[in-house]
């Protein structure tokens, strides 16, 4: 497992309290990243156990939903694929747009880019995009300025060498991290603004066509840019051909 640089200890002085808080925030973020990397290292073992559980379920004909959002998610199909470093399936295929188009540190729609990940408000939302029925992944590194990849047994996990926007993506698994200094409602449109990609009822990224949006398996009416980002929410955008809404299994992810 890659080693992680220890954050510098805060120094005494008039700004000691602020530095102490920054240090504590960095420690919390570092601990979260450590848990993610440990989880990634255990994916193979978890998958093996999962095979046994699936076989048992098939025998007795019953199943149990442990995901916090499973009961409220109307989508009947679950996204599948190799588990990534956040124990959410990695998205395969041609990315919708490169992460390199994203903003490079300037404030975007009130959202700042800071050297440490903020932890006062910390949730995760999943976004899936289909274009004419074909999955178009979100690339890792959106909202992470000058990203650096940490290689894990389950794929790359990106961290910033400069700063993190409060909305960002660590891996190519569709998970949008909302990590902000205060609790407020952020939107999908703000995420696309950081990415510098279009999002309207007729366009997603550079792709034009009728856009159908789903939130937790339920069709969303209105401007997709206004969709709020909420904890363990599954958002799906279909450009052109409509795909039956899908969800992810959050129950194994430490998110």
Task: Tell where the protein language model's regions lie, with residue ranges.
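Ubiquitin-like/PB1-type beta-grasp interaction modules and other compact soluble beta-rich domains
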Residues: 2-4, 50-255
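Terminal targeting segments of Actinobacterial cell-envelope proteins
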Residues: 1-34
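Hydrophobic single-pass membrane-targeting/anchoring helices
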Residues: 28-62
């Amino acid at each position: 497992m890659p080693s992680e640089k220890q954050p510098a200890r805060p120094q005494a002085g008039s700004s000691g309290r602020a530095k102490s808080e920054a240090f504590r925030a960095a420690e919390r973020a570092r601990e979260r990243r450590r848990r993610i990397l440990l989880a990634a290292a255990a994916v193979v073992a978890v998958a093996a156990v999962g095979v046994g559980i699936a076989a048992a379920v098939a025998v007795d004909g019953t199943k149990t939903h442990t995901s916090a959002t499973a009961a409220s998610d109307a989508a009947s199909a679950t996204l599948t694929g190799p588990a990534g470093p956040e124990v959410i399936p990695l998205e395969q295929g041609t990315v919708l747009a490169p992460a390199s188009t994203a903003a490079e540190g300037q404030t975007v729609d009130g959202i700042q880019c800071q050297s440490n990940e903020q932890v006062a408000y910390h949730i995760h939302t999943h976004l899936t995009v289909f274009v004419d029925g074909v999955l178009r992944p979100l690339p890792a590194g959106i909202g992470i300025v000058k990203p650096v990849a940490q290689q894990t047994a389950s794929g790359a996990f990106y961290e910033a060498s400069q700063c993190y926007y409060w909305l960002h993506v660590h891996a190519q698994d569709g998970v949008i991290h909302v990590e902000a200094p205060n609790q407020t409602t952020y939107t999908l449109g703000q995420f696309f603004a950081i990415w510098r990609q279009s999002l309207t009822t007729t366009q997603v990224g550079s792709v034009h066509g009728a856009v159908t949006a789903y939130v937790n398996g339920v069709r969303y009416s209105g401007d997709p840019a206004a969709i709020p980002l909420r904890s363990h929410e599954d958002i799906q955008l279909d450009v052109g051909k409509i795909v039956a809404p899908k969800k992810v299994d959050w129950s194994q992810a430490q998110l």
